[in-house]
Regions:
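A short, amphipathic beta-strand motif
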Residues: 302-310
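Hydrophobic h-region of N-terminal signal peptides that target proteins for export
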Residues: 6, 10-19
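Secondary-structure transition/turn motif
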Residues: 115-116, 348-352, 391-395
Length: 400
């Protein structure tokens, strides 16, 4: 089965590539009730987004996107530096949202304002009088109450989210996990874990990671700050990181479906570690999805209606997928009803997320779908349970 899924994915990419919509980036200015200034946002949609109208995409939120390099690196690395799911079930396409931190001299608002809270332990270090801090709760509210609803309303999203940050924005991303559970998954590159008398490290040490029952991915990394540049970054930086990384490495703190990954890149300095670290993180994340999300079945059950459309359909069309009602990935899973010579349909009650594919009774004769991205077809939530898939007219079935 695995080999056939890979062949299908490759065939779909080749056959659809000539007609697929190019990837695009939209620049957006958003008013916010939490800020006196507009927030600048970048939204990337992958190749084929408009064509693949039956695909709902996970969303990656990238902070510090005012440094356009960081935002662009994420979608570029996914396309050229990440290994695909070896079983072909997990797609490689994401919607990516870049959140820019401003430099506003007229109101003395800067990047650190976005990523630091008000101090609990006095005005020292990053919290000295005249420094910039205190608005991280407002940024969380903006993301949760304004940006995420905007993205969900205007784009086809799965509901699953990943937050990525570097340095102070990495600290912010980790803080979002322990204070707001803002994202499902987290990538933190060279986080500052020592500010405000190790506030973040202390909070992570006290956080009940096992309270989350659904799959989760947590990645954190450090560059040469603690091994080769301690005189610049200080003993506190090293101590904070060691406390956080110790927790993340200890699997006893987590449920089995939580995957943690901790890396160090001592050959790279603080800023330049972003590329190798995010490359490693995204590869780990794809594998996490392949192993932990493809096999995950939630408790929610919903009625679904699924159609497969094409010309002169045969009467031996099957749907198969990740649960008993879908045949548990047996090639000859559940036979669909031939409504007409152009429509096969089926109504089921499925656990969500439901993942499935179409065959003619064997993996050598798997359907090639024109209006969905590669990987398994997925129904993520009860709001989008009617799906209509179209066979590729030129070559609708593998092996025919």
């Amino acid at each position: 089965m695995n080999k056939k899924i890979i062949i299908t994915a490759l065939l779909a990419l080749v056959s659809l590539g000539a007609n697929a919509q190019l990837e695009s980036v939209k620049e957006l200015s958003m008013k916010s009730e939490y800020f006196s200034h507009e927030r600048q946002v970048l939204i990337y949609t992958p190749v084929g987004y408009k064509q693949f109208d039956q695909t709902y995409y996970d969303v990656i939120y990238v902070f510090d996107a005012q440094d356009r390099t960081m935002f662009d690196l994420v979608h570029c690395l996914l396309n050229i530096a990440c290994k695909p799911d070896p079983d072909g079930g997990r797609g490689m396409s994401f919607i990516i949202v870049g959140i820019c931190s401003p430099t506003l001299w007229d109101i003395n608002y800067f990047r650190n304002n976005d990523y630091l809270p008000m101090p609990l332990h006095g005005n020292k270090g990053l919290f000295k009088e005249g420094y910039y801090y205190g608005n991280s709760p407002d940024l969380k509210k903006f993301v949760k109450n304004e940006l995420m609803p905007y993205v969900a309303k205007n784009y086809r999203t799965s509901g699953r989210t990943l937050g990525i940050g570097h340095s102070l924005s990495a600290s912010f991303v980790l803080d979002c996990m322990i204070t707001d559970d803002l994202f499902d998954d987290y990538i933190a590159v060279s986080p500052n874990c020592s500010y405000d008398e190790y506030r973040l490290a202390t909070d992570i040490e006290g956080y009940q990671f096992k309270s989350r029952k659904t799959p989760r991915f947590i990645y954190a990394s450090m560059a040469r700050e603690i091994e080769k540049e301690p005189e610049y970054w200080g003993d506190e930086w090293k101590a904070g990181w060691e406390r956080v990384s110790t927790i993340l490495k200890d699997k006893s703190h987590f449920n089995e479906n939580t995957v943690t990954s901790v890396h160090t890149f001592p050959e790279y300095e603080h800023y330049r570690s972003f590329m190798p670290s995010v490359t490693a993180a995204l590869n780990d994340y794809i594998m996490f999805g392949a192993k932990n999300l493809v096999g995950y079945i939630g408790e929610e059950i919903s009625p679904v209606h699924i159609e497969l459309r094409g010309k002169n359909l045969p009467n031996d069309i099957y749907i198969t997928g990740n649960q008993e009602a879908l045949g548990n990935w047996e090639a000859e899973g559940v036979k669909m009803n031939l409504v007409s010579d152009s429509i096969a349909a089926i109504d089921l009650r499925l656990h969500l997320p439901a993942q499935f594919k179409f065959t003619r009774g064997s993996w050598e004769r798997e359907a090639v779908i024109e209006n969905a991205d590669t990987g398994n077809h997925i129904i993520h939530d009860a709001e989008h349970t009617t799906r209509i898939y179209r066979l590729w007219e030129r070559n609708p079935w593998l092996g025919e």
